[in-house]
Amino acid sequence: YIAAEGPDGLYLIDQHSAHERILFEKMVEEMNGRIVSQMLLEPRVIHLNASLMEAFEAQKETLLSIGFKVEPFGVDSIRVEAIPSVIQHLDVGEAILAALERDDEDQNLIEQTIEKKIISRICKHAAIKGGQVLSMQEQEKLIRDLENCESPRTCPHGRPTMIYLSVDMLARQFGRLGSR
């Protein structure tokens, strides 16, 4: 978690949920504009079980529309040549599996398009992990990026990205309410 002082109190930021929101909005913005894909140095072949291969066939066009360059490769494999640049740090196999696997949290995404559901699953895997140590610069960048989001208070699954503690609440907790 990141603790950040605001003008009238303190914000506790869940770095995973915040980064998930940031990545989600960047990918949706790219999907609605010019998609930037990162070509892989070498195409990656990923073997899929029958149900994932079926999911791939059903979602192939969606994957293409969000920045993947992917095609069937034999009976039980796919070949990935590019991934969305926003998630270029994520393992290619993990990105594909995140896109294709069903997630229990998808039920919270009823109003979202299939593209946004897939993007949400990918961002969940691509986001900074809870407990991961971030440098001060990384924390500051995360906070700035979150401030620029359209919906900075929740991740795409609806969990809060931050908790606000007012100066009055802090003063009460420290027994200083009447001492000002």
Residue ranges and their predicted role:
Residues Y1-R180:
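Long, charged low-complexity intrinsically disordered regions
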